[in-house]
Curated annotation (Swiss-Prot):
FAD binds at G13, G14, G15, H16, A17, G18. The gene is mnmG. Its main location: cytoplasm. PANTHER family: GLUCOSE INHIBITED DIVISION PROTEIN A (PTHR11806), PROTEIN MTO1 HOMOLOG, MITOCHONDRIAL (PTHR11806:SF0). This is tRNA uridine 5-carboxymethylaminomethyl modification enzyme MnmG. Keywords: Cytoplasm, FAD, Flavoprotein, NAD, tRNA processing. Belongs to the MnmG family. GO terms for biological process: tRNA methylation; tRNA wobble uridine modification. NAD(+) binds at residues 273-287. The keyword tRNA processing applies. It comes from Chromohalobacter salexigens (strain ATCC BAA-138 / DSM 3043 / CIP 106854 / NCIMB 13768 / 1H11). Its cofactor is FAD.
Length: 631
């Protein structure tokens, strides 16, 4: 049968990518359908119960700045919050939260069920309706045909998913859930490049059987950070500690003796695993000189005794897992509640996507999350939001939007994927961003909320909060610029204790704040009390003003390349001087801009210059554009 309603946007998958995609499209006014094989697992944290971390919290804050759900759900479900790299510069500071799985999932489901324009439907998707290279809808497992203007695929690890425990394996999207094999076969029949990746999870432990007295305690921060720009500490549930354990020589002996029973080392698994979250087998094998590896013992929630031992992800047989766990100090009597496993799944080469995450071969079809070769809740959620908003814009007849690399980590993530592709699960790090001094987690709202408002993603409450904050920053910045301190003033006398030498002349407060010895609180005696987030922003902008200005100049030069778009039908075979190899790379990637072409591995600056000359010859760009690029 045909579903009685037609939708603007259909989202397949209810994980972190799918939920953000559906919420984004619905916030923009599109009639949106979220298809999931099980409504009870919406927003499920399939791997570790944590949100944020280095590079990842930057994405979470950007999602939040654009009106997304992840940060708010984290504030409602977070049971431990910490700021990582707190003693380093603001560009690399990152908030990380341990989350209660049940509370987090409930928060996401609550937002979905209360979002206007959004319909939830428990049905697995088995097929796509494609006509004239354009997706028209979806066919469910029970044969229901649902029609829509745009479709977003957020299938996670479910496409052709195979779960491995030792040399035994079975089909599955994750533990306890079936795979999406019919949809995987349908996608393989379309002109996409497909490959396999793998990820894994550790055995879960019963806290009642763990000896915490011999483990290192890892408390959260006090005062507790918040994840959302609208977050409040009183939203947080009860806070708890995590703990740290360590593997040892005996643990490593057990693993080495059983590598022939590992599906990874016996050739059963062909997919590549995440480099930055390796299995314990990988760690012991690759880092044979290390006598010990850390294990972060993370509580799964406030109402359960289950623990997540982060650091011993494994696909070894259960009897070996049992020995490994019992060999660890503090785990000598530990009871395993669920065995660890590896899962192998299909992913599609993200170079087959545009910046909007729409596929190049099938119009109105968008991919987001692990289907694009990424790993991590945060990376998936960020892609989901972008794909959802662009699916909505496509349905509304509007042009696509995507942030540039200098505007957001989301821009870095997408540009890396669609330009270079990935041979292993892609994880975000601050080191991937060239302009990370501008892309801090503390200023994601200043970078993106105004854009989000224009796109229709940001509601009145968030906009009012943001506007108040932005105005307060401007007022305080102006006060610091206009206020002068005389050497004989009381403030100057108080500051002399913090400075190398007393002030010898008058200074503006703004100039004093640039000094490393002083912070905003030292200069705020006569000012109205400021929100800490406002004071932090004023201080960072003052202290890093010179560095930020230099980085902005560099960005302005790069933007000239970004502005030069390459025609979709550009025939690289007709461009004189390009090597056969470079022609092949450009033809395969089909870059959208001159700057993107320059970021393709193996495409030289000389080749970019040849592209520029060719465009000028074909009068595809104006002479002044070429002059601007060469300036």
């Amino acid at each position: 049968m045909d579903y009685p309603d037609r939708f603007d946007v259909i989202v397949i998958g209810g994980g972190h990518a799918g939920t953000e995609a559906a919420l984004a499209a619905a916030r923009m006014g599109c009639q949106t359908l979220l298809l999931t094989h099980n409504i009870e697992t919406l927003g499920q944290m399939s791997c570790n119960p944590a949100i944020g971390g280095i590079g990842k919290s930057h994405l979470v804050k950007e999602i939040d700045a654009l009106g997304g759900a992840m940060a708010h759900a984290t504030d409602l479900g977070g049971i431990q919050f910490r700021v990582l790299n707190a003693r380093k510069g603001p560009a690399v500071r990152a908030t990380r939260a341990q989350a209660d799985r049940v509370r987090y999932k409930a928060a996401i489901r609550g937002m979905l069920e209360n979002q206007p324009n959004l319909t939830l439907f428990q049905q697995a998707a088995d097929d796509l309706i494609v006509e004239n290279d354009t997706v028209r809808g979806v066919v469910t497992q029970t044969g229901i045909r649902v029609f829509g203007e745009s479709v977003v695929l957020c299938t996670g690890t479910f496409l052709g998913g195979v779960i491995h425990i030792g040399l035994d394996h079975h089909a599955g999207g994750r533990a306890g859930d079936p795979p999406s094999n019919a949809l995987a076969q349908r996608l393989r029949a379309l002109p996409f490049h497909v490959d396999r990746l793998k990820t894994g999870t550790p055995p879960r432990l019963d806290a009642k059987s763990v000896d915490f007295s011999v483990l290192e305690t890892q408390p959260g921060d006090d005062p507790t950070p918040v994840m959302s720009y609208l977050g409040r500490r009183d939203q947080h549930p009860r806070q708890v500690a995590c703990h740290i354990a360590h593997t040892n020589a005996r643990t490593h002996e057990i693993i080495h003796a059983n590598l022939d029973r590992s599906p990874m080392y016996s050739g059963v698994i062909g997919g590549v695993g995440p480099r930055y979250c390796p299995s314990i087998e990988d760690k012991v094998n690759r880092f044979a000189d290390k006598s010990s590896h850390q294990i972060f013992v993370e509580p799964e929630g406030l109402d359960t005794h289950e623990l997540y031992p982060n650091g011993i992800s494994t696909s070894l047989p259960f009897d070996v897992q049992f020995e490994v766990v019992r060999s660890i100090k503090g785990f000598e009597n530990a009871h395993i509640t669920r065995p660890g496993y590896a899962i192998e799944y299909d992913f599609f080469d993200p170079r087959d996507l545009k910046h909007s995450l729409e596929t190049k071969f099938i119009h109105n079809l968008f991919f987001a999350g692990q289907i694009n070769g990424t790993t991590g809740y945060e990376e998936a959620a960020a892609q989901g939001l972008l794909a959802g908003l662009n699916a909505a814009r496509r349905a509304q007849g509007q042009d696509a939007w995507s942030p540039r690399r200098d505007e957001a980590y989301l821009g870095v993530l997408v540009d890396d994927l669609i330009t270079m592709g990935t041979q292993e699960p892609y994880r975000m790090f601050t080191s991937r961003a060239e302009h990370r001094l501008l892309l801090r987690e503390d200023n994601a709202d200043l970078r993106l909320t105004e854009i989000g408002r224009e796109l229709g993603l940001v509601d009145d409450t968030r906009w009012a909060h943001f506007s108040t904050k932005r105005e307060a920053i401007a007022r305080e910045t102006e006060r610091l610029r206009e206020t002068w301190v005389q050497p004989s003033s009381e403030l100057a006398k108080r500051l002399s204790g913090k400075l190398d030498k007393p002030l010898a002349r008058e200074y503006r407060l703004a100039d004093l704040l640039k000094r490393p010895e002083l912070n905003h609180a030292d200069l705020a005696d006569d000012a109205p009390e400021l929100d800490p987030a406002v004071a932090e922003q004023v201080q960072i902008q003052a202290k890093y003003q010179g560095y930020i200005a230099r980085q902005q100049d560099e960005i302005d030069r790069l933007r000239r390349h970004e502005a030069l778009r390459l025609p979709e039908d550009l025939d690289y075979a007709r461009i004189d001087g390009l090597s056969h190899e470079i022609r092949q790379k450009l033809e395969a990637a089909r870059p959208e801009t001159l700057a993107q072409a320059g970021r393709i591995s193996g495409v030289t600056p000389a080749a970019v210059s040849l592209l520029l000359v060719h465009l000028k010859k074909r009068r595809l760009i104006e002479d002044q554009d070429v002059q601007a690029v060469n300036a």
